[in-house]
């Protein structure tokens, strides 16, 4: 049975300290899982599927990941940065190619890869929250199907959750509520809500992470 979940991701996933109210869902995921599951959060801001590999961050995970561990991958926000070519990947070519490196690397170590679509931003029209990364979500789903990999559609889950809660409530989930011109990053409150959605996705997939006792918080 898996005891570790390694997280590869960006600033919406990474762990932040107590000096800021900013949070990433990766720092809260463990509190919604059985106590024997250890979440090791290697997500870091500003990285795309490409730069996370190029900087050796994927390899650093693969050096320590063990058989039957899990590698959760949420990438896409920074992949979409056309104005930053060092980060940018094209959804249906290079993005998919890089995702497949994570998948192959995990499997070579006897671990289980899982893909997570990019989480939604604070962007809505007429009360409905919008997907800012549609091509990356489609490309990730294609990759999951092609490689027979489990996927949690966090974009879909977060959009539905935000639309249900409404703009005023969701406003408090994002750093824009802290007086910062930031429609992407979460407050700790918002990050914890996203962690709940990921935990729900784990349960829905019936993953061998003792889903029957995932905490309902």
UniProtKB/Swiss-Prot annotation:
Keyword check for Hydrolase, yes or no.
yes
Which UniProt keywords are present, listed alphabetically? Hydrolase
Q: What triggers or suppresses the expression of this protein?
A: Up-regulated by growth on type I rhamnogalacturonan.
Q: Which residues form a coiled coil?
A: none
Q: Which residues form the signal peptide?
A: none
Q: From what superkingdom does this record's organism come?
A: Bacteria
UniProt-annotated catalytic positions: 11 (nucleophile), 178, 185
Q: Name one GO molecular function term.
A: hydrolase activity, acting on ester bonds
Q: What is its EC number?
A: 3.1.1.-
- Any matching Pfam family: Lipase_GDSL
- For the keyword Cell division, the answer is no
- Membrane-spanning intervals of the chain: none
Query: Function of this protein?
Result: May play a role in the degradation of rhamnogalacturonan derived from plant cell walls. Probably has broad substrate specificity and may degrade several types of acetylated substrates.
Q: Which family does it belong to?
A: Belongs to the 'GDSL' lipolytic enzyme family.
Q: What is this protein called?
A: Probable rhamnogalacturonan acetylesterase YesY
